[in-house]
């Protein structure tokens, strides 16, 4: 599972996901990519599940790049706890994804294989996505 090695603060505000992604919205490394069409928090487990699905599908042929990293801690309060008495403890990490962001990139395989692998990874994501080709 992906998570930061060290971070300055244990807890973070939730924040807002306004607008579109101006960074990380172009294909940089591979030939094929999966692009987000909706804003969402994507957990480190979902990122890992998508990566595994793609890796299993392309086997040895292709190379895969994960373009998002979960750097936001999400806190959860224990169940049946009364209101107040501070913020909960950090449970898991999420990547804040805005529309237009590239999630995964791939190269070194045929288009039909890449399309199949990326569609399987897309089914693991909690948002609408699209398959794009560079060039």
From Swiss-Prot:
Give the GO biological process terms: mitochondrial translation
> Which residues pair up as cystines?
none
Q: Which domain of life is it from?
A: Eukaryota
What InterPro entries does the record tag this protein with? Ribosomal_uL16, Ribosomal_uL16_bact-type, Ribosomal_uL16_CS, Ribosomal_uL16_dom, Ribosomal_uL16_sf
Q: Where in the cell is it found?
A: Plastid, Chloroplast
Q: Which UniProt keywords apply?
A: Chloroplast, Plastid, Ribonucleoprotein, Ribosomal protein
A single GO molecular-function term is:
rRNA binding
Pfam families, per the entry: Ribosomal_L16
An annotated GO cellular component of this protein is: chloroplast
The record's note on quaternary structure and interaction partners says: Part of the 50S ribosomal subunit.
Please report which protein family the annotation says this sequence is part of.
Answer: Belongs to the universal ribosomal protein uL16 family.
- Its name, as the record gives it, is Large ribosomal subunit protein uL16c
Specify the species.
Gossypium hirsutum
Q: What is the lineage of its organism?
A: Eukaryota, Viridiplantae, Streptophyta, Embryophyta, Tracheophyta
């Amino acid at each position: 599972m992906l998570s930061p090695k060290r971070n300055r603060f244990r807890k973070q505000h939730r924040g807002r996901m306004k607008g579109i992604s101006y960074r990380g919205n172009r294909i940089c490394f591979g030939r094929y990519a999966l692009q987000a069409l909706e804003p969402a928090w994507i957990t480190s487990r979902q990122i890992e599940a998508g990566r595994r699905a793609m890796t299993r599908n392309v086997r040895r042929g292709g190379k895969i790049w994960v373009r998002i990293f979960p750097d936001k801690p999400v806190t959860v309060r224990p169940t049946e706890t009364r209101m107040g008495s501070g913020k909960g403890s950090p449970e898991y990490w999420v990547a804040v994804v805005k529309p237009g962001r590239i999630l995964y990139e791939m190269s070194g395989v045929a288009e039909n294989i890449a399309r199949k692998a990326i569609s399987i990874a897309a089914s693991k994501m909690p948002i609408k996505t699209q398959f794009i080709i560079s060039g």
